[in-house]
């Protein structure tokens, strides 16, 4: 693996020295790494006792807040506002530390700053075994950094490969694992490892890669309350606020464990997790954790674990793949795969690319809601887009058990989020079947329950049903879609607002949110017209 200059120099010197045995070499290397750990930690500012005490109190309040599950959208919005206020106070107290580990970038785009470090990163990647002949990193308006073709690339041509040793996953820093036997999502393990490497600064072997990562993101973790308010009433609102709640809770757990549940760590490598605890105690702050989680959310890919097994083979774990993750998204097909035999990620061109054009990859089938919340962008040409509608059986419905038996046969949950689709389908078969079951009379339920093997017919648009039943089904869908669209009708001057925003700098998030609203409204409006036409028929 390519390493920074200091680490390379150190390694060469060690190789040149005669060694009497492996133990001596190992002890020497450990001593150097221990010294580097201490150097990295000592370079960071420490908070005084008063600020630490205030932070401890705020983190306890934060944990108490996020433990409460909001009962409805209004409560969820109120909780989000309280959460943002607490995080604001926490970030003010942590500011000296934040400036050290996540230095503020000026209002000008940070891509020029990153581009200045691209040369060092490209050399590091090449030394580490990345093969990217025909590609280079460049600035593209509207994308920041991306990959540019330096020669014509043929469709299906292998254009990029990244070896396992240059793929950052939770298995790289297992000695830093803070959580012991606690089960944690793989992407959060990776985010924690990235926190550690960021704190290690110049002593991290991943420094050239970290230096070219964005300084901030357009993910929901960076939204202001005013920006989040633009999502209220949309399908993305609950998911976005839930994401903020989960990450705040995880940060608070890490903070509490490091500062109120354990003694100060010396970073003793002989004790599992001590190095991680050591760096967490010295460098963890919310801005750093938010950055690390956003980095993972926007750039991760899954690779097979080399240490963990599942019932179906190697467990899939989250990973950051340097150089490959510079490629931006365009609709198409997935052309990136991990080759187990050669232990590398391989990427082919999904289309022919001319010299000087941007090289794109396809991130996979995701709705714009998912792209917005987890990737920080939306795709106006997304053919796989959809809008979720939450539906559920009533607990007070005397016929709920019969409805449930039909839904069980259809593998549809009794309370579920089901899809409204773009043209030409509009209503997913699962949503249509659910509403058909939901609007059945007692007699109709008896008829369908008497032969559950026929339940699959309810998934088809041309299923033979009584006219009054179909009318009730489409009327329900029409009414529900009108309610969902009502939230957009409140914004009568949205087009004017977009034009005004386009004339200002630094409005990327607002423009993205208005685009998302327009795309969701378009799907719902198309489905409403479709439902109205079917009701009339």
UniProtKB/Swiss-Prot annotation:
Gene: Setd3
Highest classification ranks of the organism: Eukaryota, Metazoa, Ecdysozoa, Arthropoda, Hexapoda
Family membership: Belongs to the class V-like SAM-binding methyltransferase superfamily. SETD3 actin-histidine methyltransferase family.
Regions of compositional bias (Basic residues) in chain numbering: 1-12
Subcellular location: Cytoplasm; Nucleus
Family annotation (PROSITE patterns): SAM_MT85_SETD3 (PS51565), SET (PS50280)
Residue ranges, annotated region (Disordered): 1-50
Domain of life, source organism: Eukaryota
Record keywords: Actin-binding, Cytoplasm, Methyltransferase, Nucleus, S-adenosyl-L-methionine, Transferase
BP-aspect Gene Ontology terms: actin modification; peptidyl-histidine methylation; positive regulation of transcription by RNA polymerase II
Record-annotated SET domain positions: 133-364
Role: Protein-histidine N-methyltransferase that specifically mediates 3-methylhistidine (tele-methylhistidine) methylation of actin at 'His-74'.
InterPro entries per the UniProt record, alphabetical: Rubisco_LSMT_subst-bd (IPR015353), Rubisco_LSMT_subst-bd_sf (IPR036464), SET_dom (IPR001214), SET_dom_sf (IPR046341), SETD3 (IPR025785), SETD3_SET (IPR044428), SETD3_SETD6_MTase (IPR050600)
Main location: cytoplasm
Reaction(s) the record says it catalyses: L-histidyl-[protein] + S-adenosyl-L-methionine = N(tele)-methyl-L-histidyl-[protein] + S-adenosyl-L-homocysteine + H(+)
EC assignment: 2.1.1.85
UniProt keyword Cytoplasm, yes or no: yes
Observed effect of gene inactivation: No visible phenotype. Cells show complete loss of actin histidine methylation.
A molecular function GO annotation: histone H3K36 methyltransferase activity
Binding site for S-adenosyl-L-methionine: 114, 143-145, 299, 325-329, 375-377
GO CC term (a single one): cytoplasm
Gene3D superfamilies per the UniProt record, alphabetical: Rubisco LSMT, substrate-binding domain (3.90.1420.10), set domain protein methyltransferase, domain 1 (3.90.1410.10)
Species per Swiss-Prot/TrEMBL record: Drosophila melanogaster (Fruit fly)
Descriptive protein name: Actin-histidine N-methyltransferase
């Amino acid at each position: 693996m390519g390493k920074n200059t200091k680490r390379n120099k150190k390694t060469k010197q060690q190789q040149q020295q005669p060694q009497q045995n492996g133990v001596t070499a190992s002890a020497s290397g450990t001593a150097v790494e221990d010294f580097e750990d201490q150097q990295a930690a000592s370079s960071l500012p420490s908070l005084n006792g008063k600020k630490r005490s205030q932070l401890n109190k705020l983190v306890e309040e934060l944990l108490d807040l996020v433990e409460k599950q909001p009962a409805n959208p209004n409560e969820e919005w109120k909780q989000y506002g309280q959460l943002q206020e607490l995080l604001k106070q926490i970030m003010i107290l942590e500011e000296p530390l934040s400036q050290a580990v996540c230095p503020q970038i000026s209002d000008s785009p940070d891509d020029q700053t990153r581009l200045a470090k691209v040369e060092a990163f490209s050399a590091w990647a090449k030394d580490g075994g990345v093969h990217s002949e025909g590609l280079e990193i460049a600035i593209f308006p509207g994308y920041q950094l991306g990959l540019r073709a330096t020669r014509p690339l043929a469709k299906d041509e292998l254009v990029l490969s990244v070896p396992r040793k240059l793929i950052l996953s939770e298995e790289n820093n297992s000695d830093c694992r803070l959580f012991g036997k606690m089960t944690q999502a793989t992407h959060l393990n990776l985010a924690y490892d990235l926190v550690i490497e960021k704190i290690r600064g110049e002593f991290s072997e991943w420094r050239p890669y970290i230096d070219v990562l964005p300084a901030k993101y357009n993910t929901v973790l960076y939204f202001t309350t005013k920006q989040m308010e633009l999502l209220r009433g949309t399908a993305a609102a609950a998911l976005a606020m839930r994401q903020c709640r989960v990450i705040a809770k995880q940060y608070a757990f890490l903070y509490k464990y490091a500062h109120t549940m354990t003694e100060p760590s010396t970073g003793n490598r002989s004790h599992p997790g001590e190095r991680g605890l050591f760096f967490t105690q010295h460098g963890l702050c919310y801005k750093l954790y938010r950055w690390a989680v956003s980095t993972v959310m926007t750039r991760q890919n899954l690779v097979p674990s080399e240490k963990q097994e599942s019932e179906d083979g190697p467990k899939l774990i989250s990973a950051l793949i340097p150089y490959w993750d510079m490629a931006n998204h365009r609709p198409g097909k997935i052309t990136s795969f991990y080759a187990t035999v050669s232990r590398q990620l391989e990427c082919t061109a999904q289309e022919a690319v001319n010299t000087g054009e941007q090289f794109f990859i396809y991130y996979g089938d995701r709705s714009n809601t998912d792209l917005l919340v987890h990737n920080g962008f939306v795709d106006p040409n997304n053919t796989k887009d959809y809008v979720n509608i939450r539906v559920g059986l009533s607990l007070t419905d005397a016929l709920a058990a019969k409805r449930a038996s039909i839904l069980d046969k259809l593998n549809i949950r009794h309370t579920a989020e089901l899809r409204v689709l773009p043209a030409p389908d509009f209503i997913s078969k699962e949503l249509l079947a659910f509403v058909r079951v939901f609007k059945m009379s007692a007699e109709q339920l008896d008829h369908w329950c008497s032969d559950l093997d026929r339940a699959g017919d309810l998934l088809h648009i041309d299923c033979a049903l009584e006219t009054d039943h179909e009318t009730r089904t489409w009327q329900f869908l029409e009414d529900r879609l009108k309610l969902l669209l009502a939230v957009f009708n409140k914004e009568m001057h949205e087009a004017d607002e977009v034009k005004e925003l386009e004339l200002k700098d630094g409005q990327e998030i607002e423009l993205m949110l208005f685009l998302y609203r327009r795309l969701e409204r378009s799907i719902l409006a198309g489905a409403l017209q479709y439902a109205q036409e079917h009701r009339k028929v």
